[in-house]
Amino acid sequence: MKKHRLPDTELARIAPLAPDARRKALLKFKNGFPDFSYEPTRRRLPELTNAQPSLLSLGDTEWSKIESGLKRLKNEKEAASNIEVAELLYNFIREEKYIAVMEPFGKLQLGAGVAISYWSDAIFFGPDGPTIFGFDFRRAGGFNDSARRFAFSAQHEHIRQRGDDYATAKLGLVQFPALRNGTRKVRVEFADQVELIPYDELIQMARETYSVWFEILEQREDEARKTGTGGSWWDGD
């Protein structure tokens, strides 16, 4: 059986739950996997945030060029959703005058083949000093308080705890929820008043969640073999 990873955004939402609630959430996610991805926007984060090799800017990418690339996505819903959040992020970074500098942070290893990332490979310099930003592009069902706490804790462990220039960096998450009229907005949360989760607890939460997740996937594979339907519930990573 191919062991499909959970999206990091789903892990942050599900891992802090109590065991029974965690299993229910994993079953619900398995049965309702989204029909499109925000990966096209994630791949364009350096352009959207105007991330530079250093504090000296080498020029900006025009929004029209990014939009043109996203319009070529074959899935119309995916194209429209990615364009919507990408433009919001593009404008947010420039209106708030953040300067993004490339930094290959990599992923936080949690063991058992699990590695997570709630940040882009850039550090953002603004009026309050350096900030680490993670991005949740979902319209609904995005980070709640406990999921943000999980993500902030991962940011702290992987980047602040390195003991380098970013030990005092602010921790931030940028979300793009929908308003009642259906339009999206930028919502920014910081970890200033959040009690962070210790690293060993973070690892335990992730391992317990993945243990149940792999069990659910294995049961699904067994059912498919018995009924002759074959294949996995999910055809790609």
Curated annotation (Swiss-Prot):
The keyword Cytoplasm applies. Induction: Induced by DNA damaging agent mitomycin C, part of the socA-socB operon. It is found in: Cytoplasm. One of its GO terms (cellular component) is cytoplasm. The keyword Transferase does not apply. Keywords: Cytoplasm, Toxin-antitoxin system. Disruption phenotype: Deletion of this gene allows growth of cells disrupted for clpP or clpX, deletions which are otherwise lethal. Degraded by ClpXP, recognition of SocB by ClpX requires SocA. Interacts with cognate antitoxin SocA and with beta sliding clamp (dnaN). Toxic component of an atypical type II toxin-antitoxin (TA) system. Upon overexpression in the absence of its cognate antitoxin SocA, leads to inhibition of colony formation, cellular filamentation, incomplete DNA replication and induction of the SOS response. Exercises toxicity by binding the beta sliding clamp (dnaN), blocking DNA replication and leading to premature replication fork collapse and incomplete cell division. Unlike most type II TA systems, the SocB toxin is unstable and targeted by its cognate antitoxin SocA for degradation by ClpXP. Not toxic upon expression in E.coli. This is DNA replication inhibitor toxin SocB.
